[in-house]
A protein has these predicted regions:
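Small beta-barrel nucleic-acid-binding modules, primarily SNase/OB-fold domains
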Residues: 1-86
Length: 86
């Protein structure tokens, strides 16, 4: 289990232990780009102040690439659905 220290953008966050985690299979707009604010807010709503499970599947640019779950639900899939609608 982990906790989120801060959300960096719509597909990346930092845990309280200092690990940067990127959601596998999620390609959110970069900070400052159109729709990025909505993606950031959505990710915050899913993971802030909650216990998360980080299942690492690789490393990219110094970040852990992972499948992330909250209450047994996939954060990755929730973000993918959100971004398709945005």
């Amino acid at each position: 289990m982990a906790r989120v220290k801060r959300v960096i953008d719509g597909d990346t966050f930092e845990t309280n232990s200092g690990q940067r985690v990127r959601l596998a299979g999620v390609d959110a707009p970069e900070k400052g780009k159109p729709r990025s604010a909505k993606a950031i807010e959505k990710l915050k709503s899913l993971i802030e102040k909650k216990d998360i499970i980080v299942d690492p599947i690789g490393i990219s640019y110094g970040r852990i690439v992972a499948d992330v779950k909250v209450d047994g639900k996939s954060v990755n899939k929730s973000m993918q659905r959100h971004l398709k609608r945005a």
